[in-house]
Amino acid sequence: MLYDFVFNGWGMKFAANHDNLITRNLCHMKTFSDEVVPANMQPFVLEGGSIESDGKGTLMTTVECLASVNRNEYLQQEELERYLKDIFGLDRILWITSGYLAGDDTDSREDTIAYVRCEDEEDEHYEELKAMEEEIKEFTRANGEPYRLIPLPMADKVEWEGERLPATYANFLIMNGAVLVPFYDSPKDEIAKAALREAFSDREIIGINCLPLIKQHGSLHCVTMQYPEGFIE
């Protein structure tokens, strides 16, 4: 099943009309296997980077993104939860209410959460990310056991044309046999790489210079789309 949701330019910040045509155009071009059944899930707004699942019935998301008035204003949080559980076959949803930088990401193991920890009290993200850290410490797995938490360093400030860019090591990309981690020409790059090596001991950890990419306000995870094996013809 191939779900086609609405992408509205990260909460109507940018025009996204052409983006929303990609999935149906690929279907018309017969890009996908004949066994793939497309399903029109519009007008529900859901961007890929806003949800994370352990593949075991638990999904993690943020209130600020998914329940934003610029995305799904016609649905209350309880309605969002029922909808997500229904279409994805979920047992439960963990809602994060803190952390305005996209600095959290679950990895492929269902017992681990990798997240950004900010230790600089003068950093503008400190309070929000500290609150997020305390929040996820209270999360438990479906069996009641706590998650294994792996902190990633807060990336050094990256500025361009007078603006601070959303550099984060949590924007890593999991792929077959490897994990690509954003590098920002900082001593913290190797710290982040070592942390992810702890989380993914069975994969190669590869650093990618993302200073050019971050100028577009995103990184590795933001600019990629993963399809399950067998989807592409």
Language model segments and positions:
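The feature marks the mature, well-folded catalytic cores of soluble enzymes
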Residues: M1-E233
